[in-house]
A protein has these predicted regions:
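Generic structural signal for helix capping and beta-alpha/helix-loop junctions
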Residues: 10-12, 35, 67
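A contiguous pocket-lining binding segment that forms or flanks enzyme active sites
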Residues: 20-62
């Protein structure tokens, strides 16, 4: 049996799984699938959550990753940072585009984009 699920987030940003989903994780081999991994922060929360709920993480895969590994787990990705010229990920106070007051064109997330 293969289960595919996504976590919810509580008020402090922790990933949680409801009671009806927990049996899909507890004692199971888990493959974490991501679209994009930039800093690894969300991936770290995913690892913490899956281990908390008793899952056995067997792999991490993504379409793009700027991170090679997390928590001693290799990240397997189709594209890496070296494949995207001039790729950068910054904290807002370190962003060179922000410092140059360069405006952004849109906000993009899993539901689409909104032009600004």
């Amino acid at each position: 049996t293969i289960y595919i699920t996504s976590p919810e987030y509580n008020s402090v940003g922790q990933m949680i799984f409801r009671d009806n989903i927990q049996p899909m994780i507890y004692g199971k081999n888990v493959l974490i699938l991501n679209g994009a991994i930039t800093t690894g922060a969300t991936l770290s929360r995913a690892v913490e959550s899956i281990l908390y709920y008793g899952g056995k993480i067997r792999g991490v895969a993504a379409i793009f990753s700027a991170v090679n590994s997390i928590a001693q787990l290799p990240v397997h990705s189709i594209f890496q940072q070296r494949d995207i010229p001039d790729y950068g990920s910054y904290k807002f106070h370190d962003c060179p585009l922000c410092k140059n007051k360069q405006k952004i064109d849109a906000i993009v997330n899993g539901w689409g984009y909104s032009k600004l």
